[in-house]
Amino acid sequence: MKIDVQKITSQQDGLELEVAVVKPQSPAVGVVVFSHGMAEHKERYFDFIKYLSQHGFACVIHDHRGHGQSVKSESDLGYFYTQNINCIVDDLHQVVGFAKSLFPNLPIMLFSHSMGTLVSRCYLKKYDGEIDKLVLCGPPTENKMAGLAICIAHLSQLFHGKKHANKMLNKLTFGSYNKGLEAENAWICANEETVKKYNEDKLCGFIFTTNGFINLFKLMKQAFNKKGWSVAHADLPIYVIAGEEDPVIQNQKAFDGLVKFLRDRGYNDINSKLYAGMRHELLNEIDNAKVYSDVLKFLVK
């Protein structure tokens, strides 16, 4: 698989964003744009991208600001350079436009994971007419404490600064996720090898800065704000998937609540699935072949 790595300049603030492009060997049947999760990077999706390219899909994935190579220095991991969430959302909008320029007249599919689903849902509110299908994988469900969390984060920023790696907010947000599990970050995946690689990767699992947490909480609040949905593409096919043992979805009731929230906004073509025995990173589970196949079926139907 040939990977073309490029830099594009964010139209929001001039930050350099690193983008990887993969073309299939046969004529492309569609384009999959990715929106990755928190405290990880684009390279973790290359196995799935290889699978999609073998089935005729071109793929475009960038490192979100504050992640991977979309930082000014390694010390900026978890720092977004702004507290305006429109920047990370419109970065995605720009990458979708970039993908369209590379592969004109092809359907655009958006695959998003975890925090990336918050970005894609905020993107959806403004730009749903730009894409042809949407996958939400491991999506955070509604947390009604998001507003309070923003206030706490701003207060913490007054004392510690915006670039402070905020262990307190990290514990408040994720402290319960690993309950009952032995290995560090075992909540992300039942596949022990995946967890081991994640823990050994310096571009994964870093603690967000206070600025990063403010952005995260704002994304959560905006994604579940009932106001501001244009719904220009009401019949957009949406596929919502998660592991039954994923703490990010909280529970099945909250997961079903997310699906209902999108239906209530006006989207009428939503399917969902929970995978038994799987945790947060469906693409990296031992039985990921089933997930790969299900997503592919959704993309091609």
Residue ranges, per PLM feature:
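Short beta-strand/loop motif that positions the catalytic acidic residue
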Residues: 240-242
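Active-site glycine-rich loops that stabilize anionic/oxyanionic intermediates
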Residues: 36-40, 115, 244-245
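Alpha/beta-hydrolase active-site loop
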Residues: 80-100
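Alpha/beta-hydrolase-fold enzymes
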Residues: 120-203
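Catalytic active-site module of serine/aspartate enzymes centered on a nucleophile-bearing elbow/loop
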Residues: 263-301
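Conserved alpha/beta-hydrolase
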Residues: 44, 49-75
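Alpha/beta-hydrolase fold nucleophile elbow
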Residues: 103-114
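N-terminal cap/lid segment of alpha/beta-hydrolase-fold proteins
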Residues: 1-24
